[in-house]
Regions:
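N-terminal active-site segment of His-dependent metallophosphoesterases
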Residues: 1-38
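Active-site environment of divalent metal-dependent phosphoester hydrolases
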Residues: 1-2, 27-30, 57-61, 109, ...
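Short, glycine/charged-enriched secondary-structure capping and boundary segments
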Residues: 5-8, 34-37, 65-68, 130-131, ...
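A short acidic-Thr-Gly-centered motif at the start of a beta-strand
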Residues: 8-12, 42-44, 107-111, 149-151, ...
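Active-site neighborhood of divalent metal-dependent phosphoester bond hydrolases
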Residues: 16, 28-112, 123, 132-149
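Residue-level marker for buried hydrophobic side chains located in beta-strands
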Residues: 19-21, 51-52, 115, 159, ...
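Divalent metal-coordination and catalytic microenvironments
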Residues: 24, 54-55, 118, 162, ...
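Acidic, His/Gly-rich catalytic cores of divalent-metal-dependent hydrolytic chemistry
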Residues: 138-239
Length: 239
């Protein structure tokens, strides 16, 4: 499983790593039960594992509430029904609910000079002024500029997902990263990508899902699109 492989690389490279997930935890892959297991095991071992809220986390929570109110799985949307079924059969539904409840309570996580947010921000309003809805759902309409093209770095480094790209995006200002998008389409056969803030380094593992929508090609190993001011080190690995 890609998530577990990526975690193993991150733990090997930085034994004290704080792990922050970009959301959409349980409905983007075939084994949500293994995601629960991985998070639970890391926490049991003393690791700090957190997640910001993604739009699919909200959808899953809404589906769980409907299911609790009497809706059958057949009445729910397919992705959410599948996740609930797998989690329930594996005995992981209660733990998943707990993780999901924590996740949807956080629209961003902020540190010294950086913040993690699922979708993005309104560059005119900044991180503090952007609504929770936009932080989760911010995405350019087809043919429109991405929000990060107008971002000047005033809120520091922003690490985001939500908008799948064929390659990881690192946008720089004066040589320093100001936006990193790590959504590289793992659900579509691309890559699962992480970013190490301290080392300005991308870590990537190849998806095991069928390639579609143009994903599946090996990304460049130097400066990806949108990157400027120097190369970005990447680690790509095929299963």
């Amino acid at each position: 499983m890609e998530f577990i492989e990526l975690l193993e690389i991150a733990r090997r490279d930085r034994v004290d790593a704080r792990i922050i997930l970009l959301g959409d935890l349980f409905t983007k892959g075939p084994r949500p039960d293994l995601v629960v297991e991985a998070i639970s095991e890391l926490r049991a071992g003393g690791r700090r594992v957190e997640s910001v809220c993604g739009n699919h986390d909200l959808r899953l929570m809404d589906a769980l509430r409907k299911h609790d109110a009497g809706a059958s799985l057949d009445e729910l949307t397919p992705a959410e029904a599948y996740a609930i079924r797998v989690l329930d059969r594996a005995g992981k539904l209660t733990a998943a609910r707990r993780i999901l409840t924590e996740t949807i309570s956080k629209t961003y996580i902020q540190g010294a000079g950086w913040a993690v947010v699922h979708g993005g921000i309104d560059p005119q309003l900044g991180l503090a002024g952007t609504s929770d809805f936009e932080k989760i759902h911010k995405k350019a309409a087809p043919g429109r500029p991405h929000w990060w093209e107008s971002y000047n770095g005033d809120d520091g480094l922003l690490i985001v997902g939500h908008k799948p790209l064929f390659e990881p995006m690192v946008l720089r200002r004066d040589g320093n990263p100001i936006v990193v998008n790590v959504d590289t389409g793992c659900a579509y056969g691309g890559f699962l990508t992480a970013y190490c803030i301290e080392e300005d380094r991308l870590i990537m593992v190849a998806s095991q899902q069928p390639a579609r929508d143009g994903f599946g090609a090996t990304p460049v190993a130097t400066a990806p699109r949108w990157a400027s001011g120097g190369p970005v080190r990447t680690f790509a690995r095929r299963p």
